[in-house]
């Protein structure tokens, strides 16, 4: 079964063609500068096929981008499938499903209406996701099933005590202001892999998943269900990130805005784009640059790393308390998979909880493995995330179910 996975942005479109049954990746690539001057990248994962790297292709809209993807996939010389009929379904990453969607869903006219209603919750992302769906329908026709897979859906199992903000209740009732959480597809994927690695049913496990990258979140997963997560109404909440502040005292906004005359848009832009480890370090939002600067003695870079790891550690402790224990801690995403120093800093001091890192096992990048010591009561796992495979797997399951 071949699933085309689409992640549509406002002027870009990432794609992968996968077989979720075997886990095989057939091709992947990127359409950039849609509506501007169109750059197309195609990377077939089959030997002897030619890579196209940022070649000029006219893509006035997302429909032309989808057509370019299909043309490349079925190209007689460099294609990886014989015809479009070999694509069984399309799986779309959709950022926000609000309270309407607690799982992935076959896209229908009713679903499209509900997606439109979620736009106020994710005004930057959902319109682009909807555009991607419409482009696939326009080019591929209505006979090819399409499935929406939401970043937020995995967290819809959170109890009210975890998702409710202590604001006047009418903001939740009328405006749906609550914790939604993000990175759900990633957290769901690594939780499933953790259960497989530990050889136990996921229903019996208490897991803490640390998705650490330019955007970061920690999720408490009890019996395979998300029970709490650090990101909130927006992806700005929780941990400090590459350029996002994470949690802070809301009174700071009033203080800074009053002192410098910023309006709310300027303030939110500072919180989203100029804060996090970049703001603290003054060096970079990239943890590789931070590590280099810290090693060279840059005190602010060292502080940024320490602050980040400290906040992750705090949430690990909090979520272990919330679940009444923890069986395994998972590190995933760019920083989680590749930065042994951050992993060590997070685990340092958690020995009282039964966490014991093996320094030799931790000296690894991007490989699925156990990095805790043999006698560690709580297992520490490094699991590379694969959101596209999770989207393809969900899509296949829904299409087969229907």
Language model features: what each stretch is:
Residues 8-9, 92-95, 212, 326, ...:
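Glycine-rich beta-strand-to-loop/alpha-helix junction loops that act as flexible
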Residues 12-59, 232:
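Short glycine-rich, Thr/Ser-proximal phosphate-binding strand/loop in the N-terminal lobe
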Residues 72-88, 196-201, 316-327:
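Phosphate/pyrophosphate-binding loops at sites that engage ATP/ADP/AMP, CoA/4′-phosphopantetheine
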Residues 73-125, 145-147, 153-162:
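Short beta-strand-loop/turn "lid" adjacent to the catalytic site in phosphate-handling enzymes
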Residues 154-257:
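Glycine-rich phosphate-binding loop of actin/hexokinase-like ATP-binding domains
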Residues 222, 227-263, 269, 333-364:
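Catalytic phosphate/nucleotide-handling subdomain of diverse soluble enzymes
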Residues 269, 276-280, 287-322:
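Adenine-nucleotide phosphate-binding core of ATP-dependent small-molecule kinases
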């Amino acid at each position: 079964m071949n699933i085309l996975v689409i992640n549509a942005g406002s002027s870009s479109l990432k794609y992968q063609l996968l077989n979720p049954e075997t886990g095989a990746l057939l091709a992947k690539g990127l359409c950039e500068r849609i509506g501007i001057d169109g750059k197309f990248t195609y990377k077939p994962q089959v030997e002897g096929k030619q890579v196209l790297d940022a070649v000029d292709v006219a893509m006035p809209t997302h429909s032309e981008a989808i057509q370019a993807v299909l043309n490349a996939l079925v190209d007689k010389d460099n294609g990886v499938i014989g015809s479009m009929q070999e694509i069984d379904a399309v799986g779309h990453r959709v950022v926000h499903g609000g309270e309407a969607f607690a799982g992935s869903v076959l896209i229908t006219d009713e679903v499209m209406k509900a997606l439109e209603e979620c736009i106020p919750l994710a005004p930057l992302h959902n319109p682009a996701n909807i555009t991607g769906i419409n482009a696939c329908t326009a080019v591929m026709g209505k006979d090819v099933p399409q499935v929406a897979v939401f970043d937020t859906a995995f967290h819809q199992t959170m109890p009210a005590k975890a998702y409710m903000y202590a604001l006047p209740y009418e903001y939740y009732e009328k405006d749906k202001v609550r914790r939604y959480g993000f990175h759900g597809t990633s957290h769901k994927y690594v939780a499933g892999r953790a259960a497989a690695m530990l050889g136990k049913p996921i229903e019996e496990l208490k897991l803490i998943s640390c998705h650490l990258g330019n955007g970061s979140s920690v999720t408490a997963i009890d019996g395979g269900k998300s029970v709490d997560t650090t990101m909130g109404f927006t992806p700005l909440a929780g941990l400090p990130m590459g350029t996002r502040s994470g949690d802070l005292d809301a009174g700071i906004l009033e203080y800074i805005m009053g002192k410098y005359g910023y309006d709310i848009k300027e303030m939110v832009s500072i919180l989203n784009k100029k804060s996090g480890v970049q703001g603290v370090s003054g060096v970079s939002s990239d943890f590789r640059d931070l590590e280099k600067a810290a090693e060279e003695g840059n005190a602010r870079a060292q502080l940024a790393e320490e602050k980040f790891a400290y906040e992750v550690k705090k949430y690990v402790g909090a979520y272990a308390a919330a679940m009444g224990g923890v069986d395994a801690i998972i590190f995933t995403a760019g920083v989680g998979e590749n930065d042994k120093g951050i992993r060590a800093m997070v685990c340092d001091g958690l020995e009282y909880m039964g966490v014991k890192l093996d320094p030799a096992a931790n000296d690894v990048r991007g490989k699925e493995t156990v990095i805790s010591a043999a006698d560690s009561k709580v297992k520490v796992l490094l699991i590379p995330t694969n959101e596209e495979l999770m989207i393809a797997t969900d899509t296949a399951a829904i299409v087969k179910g229907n």
